[in-house]
């Protein structure tokens, strides 16, 4: 049992009974491991993904633990589907305690979504931005928002023109930009939440390069070793180890008062200089709302 995420994170004795958690992208990989770990700690869990059969299998595992579990199918490239996911959460609970923004992917072919946004950026950043905005009033006052980023956010700056273009498309470069956006978003969200009277935290993390995952298969040449070195991590990570940081951020009392940070291997790390740039955080926050044609979330908490 020591290789389970909650044991690796040192939170196996934390009691989440009565808590409600949404883990997006939880039909496989680290999302699935995170959902099951939170269930073992006592939380009721909403599972999300595109594969209904895989979602039902995770729900079955959770209900076998005695947890309340449900599955919601949603395509993250569809604004309507993301709004439908938020509506399903609001029907499920009035107080969402944990929001794990985990769903995402790495895509070889360049294409635009119906919004005219590059597909990787839309799925990996705009969708969780919209979901979080839709759920702000549903989150418990001490909720934890955990966003899956990547060490791949290093070595790139956010090219705002590339957000709406697939000219000279590189799947890995698009992935890097989206993972940088995850850290920028998570940090900007933390700053805005800090200006409210609620105690909601927002943190991002790097799960590691997991052998066999889409990320590790796509990494060119020496990059897995480079990212591991920068975050002082092993070059490869098991799925359970990758999920451990998410579980720690969702459950550990050690991070009760921690927000706006980037983590790897359950420890805070310094993200790239581009990820720490406050002007870029502000611009991304505002432009994301414009692209989605929604009011700027938490506008009263501008940096």
How would you label these PLM feature ranges?
Residues 2-214, 294, 298-303:
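Rossmann-fold NAD(P)H-dependent dehydrogenase/reductase core
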Residues 24, 167, 171, 228-232, ...:
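A short, mixed-charge helix-start or loop-turn motif at secondary-structure junctions
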Residues 37, 85, 185, 242-245, ...:
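Alpha-helical packing segments of well-folded alpha/beta enzyme cores
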Residues 53, 80, 240, 279-282:
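A generic "alpha-helical surface" signal
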Residues 165, 220-221, 254:
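A generic structural signal for secondary-structure junctions
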Residues 178, 204, 228-269, 278, ...:
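C-terminal helical subdomain
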Residues 211-229:
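A glycine/serine/threonine-rich, flexible loop-to-helix segment
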Residues 259-262, 269-303:
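C-terminal helix-and-tail extensions that cap enzymatic domains
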């Amino acid at each position: 049992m020591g290789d389970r995420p909650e044991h690796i994170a040192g939170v196996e004795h934390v009691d989440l009974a009565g808590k409600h958690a949404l883990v997006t992208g939880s039909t496989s990989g680290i999302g699935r491991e995170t959902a099951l770990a939170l269930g073992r700690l006592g939380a009721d869990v909403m599972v999300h993904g595109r594969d209904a059969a895989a979602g039902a299998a995770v729900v079955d595992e959770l209900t076998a633990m005695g947890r309340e579990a449900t599955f919601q199918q949603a395509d993250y490239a569809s604004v309507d589907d993301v709004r439908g996911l938020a509506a399903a959460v609001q029907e499920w609970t009035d107080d969402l305690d944990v929001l794990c923004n985990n769903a995402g992917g790495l895509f070889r072919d360049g294409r635009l979504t119906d919004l005219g946004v590059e597909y990787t950026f839309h799925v990996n950043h705009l969708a969780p931005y919209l979901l979080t905005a839709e759920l702000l009033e549903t989150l418990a006052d001490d909720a934890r928002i955990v966003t899956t980023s990547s060490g791949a956010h290093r070595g790139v700056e956010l090219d705002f023109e590339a957000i709406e273009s697939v000219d000279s498309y590189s799947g890995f470069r698009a992935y890097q930009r989206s993972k940088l956006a995850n850290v920028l978003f998570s940090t900007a969200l933390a700053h805005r939440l800090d200006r409210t009277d609620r105690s909601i935290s927002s943190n991002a993390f790097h799960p590691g390069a997991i052998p066999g995952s889409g990320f590790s298969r796509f990494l060119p040449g020496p990059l897995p070793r480079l990212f591991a070195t920068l975050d002082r991590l092993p070059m490869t990570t098991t799925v359970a180890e990758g999920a451990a940081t998410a579980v720690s951020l969702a459950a550990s009392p050690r991070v009760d008062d921690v927000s706006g940070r980037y983590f790897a291997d359950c420890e805070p790390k310094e993200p790239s200089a581009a990820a720490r740039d406050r002007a870029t955080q502000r611009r991304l926050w505002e432009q994301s709302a414009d692209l989605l044609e929604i009011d700027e979330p938490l506008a009263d908490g501008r940096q």
